[in-house]
């Protein structure tokens, strides 16, 4: 694979045969560290092979007629680049403690293909559908796509109106689309549950406080002009789980952290949800680890843990709380690459314009801050 000369069908056949053998059989991976590492090697090879084939189909890069085409293309196929890159690196990380060098060259080539080709190429194509009077930034809406701030009305209230007794909503911080696609496949393949997948157009800028507020029932969203630029739903702060619970009380709902719900157990859990129609459950693993410099290299491991925890959480809701409908969503996603960013990848916007109220690495928010040729500019209204 590293030499770009492998027959991928032959490779997959070989991987399948080796997995069924003694040393890397999935039924025996708990036997020893070397057995688990061998199994991870084959996971990495399989992901790299699929990535190579996908890249060959898009060798000329990406081109979209508009934002709708870009979003549809991503959710249909392009998301696989992010997924396979994550799966490869997660598997390769499991091999590293053994001190084996067999994946090192392949890892370098995967990194070059992802951070040196895929991210820049997709970024260029995405930029083109943002700009201009008819671009996405001029009107943050796409035909056929639900905006994130309409989540409650379109996804929750619609089910209640249709007769569903109780809706459980799990919000997993930074749980991105490609990971959700993997979860849906796992759920449909291993359990009696039926899972489907759809996407929304996220709020801009995409960060936790705004994304979490957008998912709540509300009539208005606005910024409070204080030091933190708090997001207000219907004039009330909703930055904490308790405050979100207060907002949900207006629709006969409650808010709770995932760990706290699981700790209640079956009987107390049923008592907790008995008089409620809407239960918002907050899960945080990916953002907790991936958004900190000291632990960001654990991002892909956090995704793997999240897939397991969300499956367990949904199973608990259905089996122990008699839930019939569970909606799983996120406040935002994430973008992560193993190699550090080059200076060319970083914004050249050094000074904060007059009127800036909130300044972060990825965005600035303010009143009348104008436009800059070094950044994309829009209006939160």
What are these regions (language model features)?
Residues 1-381:
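Feature captures the catalytic ectodomains and active-site-proximal regions of enzymes
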């Amino acid at each position: 694979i590293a030499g770009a000369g492998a027959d991928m069908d032959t490779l997959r056949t070989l991987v399948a045969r080796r997995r069924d053998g003694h040393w890397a059989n999935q039924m025996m991976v708990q036997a020893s560290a070397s057995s688990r590492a061998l199994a991870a090697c084959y996971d990495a090879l399989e992901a790299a092979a699929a990535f190579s084939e996908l890249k060959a189909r898009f060798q000329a890069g990406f081109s979209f007629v508009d934002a709708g085409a870009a979003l549809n293309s991503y959710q249909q196929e392009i998301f696989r680049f992010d997924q396979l890159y994550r799966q490869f690196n997660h598997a390769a990380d499991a091999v590293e403690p053994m001190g084996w060098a067999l994946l090192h060259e392949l890892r370098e080539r995967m990194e070059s293909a992802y951070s040196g080709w895929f991210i820049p190429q997709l970024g260029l194509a995405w930029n083109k559908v943002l700009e201009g009077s008819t671009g996405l930034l001029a009107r943050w809406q796409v035909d056929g796509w639900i905006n994130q701030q309409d989540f409650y009305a379109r996804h929750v209230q619609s089910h209640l109106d249709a007769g569903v007794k109780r809706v459980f909503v799990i919000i997993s911080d930074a749980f991105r689309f490609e990971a959700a696609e993997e979860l849906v496949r796992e759920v449909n393949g291993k359990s009696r549950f039926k899972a489907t997948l759809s996407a929304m157009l996220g709020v801009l800028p995409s960060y936790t406080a705004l994304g979490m507020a957008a998912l709540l029932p509300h009539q208005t969203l606005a910024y409070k002009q204080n030091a933190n630029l708090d997001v207000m739903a219907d004039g009330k702060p909703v930055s904490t789980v308790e405050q979100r619970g207060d907002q949900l009380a207006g629709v006969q709902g409650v808010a709770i952290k995932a760990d706290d719900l699981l700790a209640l157990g079956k009987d107390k859990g049923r008592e907790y949800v008995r008089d409620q129609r809407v239960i918002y459950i907050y899960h945080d693993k990916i953002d907790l680890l991936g958004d900190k410099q000291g632990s960001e290299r654990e991002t892909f491991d956090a995704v793997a843990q999240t897939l397991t925890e969300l499956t367990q959480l949904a199973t608990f809701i259905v089996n122990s709380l008699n839930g019939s409908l569970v909606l799983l969503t996120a406040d935002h996603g994430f973008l992560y690459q193993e190699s550090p960013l080059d200076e060319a990848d970083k914004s050249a916007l050094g000074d904060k314009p007059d009127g800036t109220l909130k300044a972060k690495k990825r965005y600035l928010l303010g009143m009348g801050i104008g436009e800059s040729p070094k950044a994309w500019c829009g209006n939160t209204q």
